Each structure stands twice: as C-alpha cells, then as structure tokens.
Amino acid sequence: MIYGIGTDLVDPARIASSLERYGEQFARRVLADSEWPDYLEHIKPALFLAKRFAAKEAFSKATGTGLRAPVMFGNMAVQHDSQGKPYFEFQQELAEWIGQRGITRHHLSISDELTMVSAFVVLEK
C-alpha cells in the first residue's frame, strides 16, 4: 500500500548560486556525512548537490511532514546500488521514525537535464 508520494524540481543554477554565496557551509547543510567524499570528487558539484537536494525534498514531501525533525537532509543519504539505481540510507533516528509509521520500502528516481533536476519518491507501507 502506498504511504506517500513526493516530487521536487530544482534548477542547478540556483544551487550553483547558493554554493558561490555560502560555499562549503551550504553543501554541508544538504549532504549527509557519508555523501561528502562523493561530493568532493564530483566534477559538477552544483549538479551533485541539486540531485541530492531534489531527492531529499521529494522524500520529505512523501512523508507528509516536509523538512522537520527527524526528516532532515543530514539524516538521509542518496546512494546507488551496483546497477546505478538510487536509494536512500537513513540515520538511526530517521530509520526508527520510518519504522514507527510502518513504512517498509521506498523508491527513488532522479532525472536531470542541463537546466533542471527532478526527483520522485514513493513510500510503501
């Protein structure tokens, strides 16, 4: 059964502007610690951040809470399986919160073009 769905659109240029203005501080607000090494190695850091930002916003919308504790950027990380499929890893606090709501599976899709990044999340009970 579907618990919730969420979607988000992000303009990578807006993320690039935030990076120029706030630098590493902005990136640290968006990324979980486990995402930091991949960010540092990425040839397009603004695009990397835009994808994470969109995915995490879409997840927050699927929960129905928006971004409020424990559904926070730092409590979730976007990873990829061996085939390149994206998925979330959750910090313990958020994982417990998800379990309390009976959410058993999640699905994440991320797409990007030159001027837009989109993410779509489905949560199942």
From Swiss-Prot:
Cited function: Transfers the 4'-phosphopantetheine moiety from coenzyme A to a Ser of acyl-carrier-protein.
GO BP terms, alphabetized: fatty acid biosynthetic process
Binding residue positions for Mg(2+): D8, E57
Protein name: Holo-[acyl-carrier-protein] synthase
Subcellular location: Cytoplasm
Protein EC: 2.7.8.7
Keyword Magnesium: yes
InterPro entries: 4-PPantetheinyl_Trfase_dom, 4-PPantetheinyl_Trfase_dom_sf, ACPS, Ppantetheine-prot_Trfase_dom
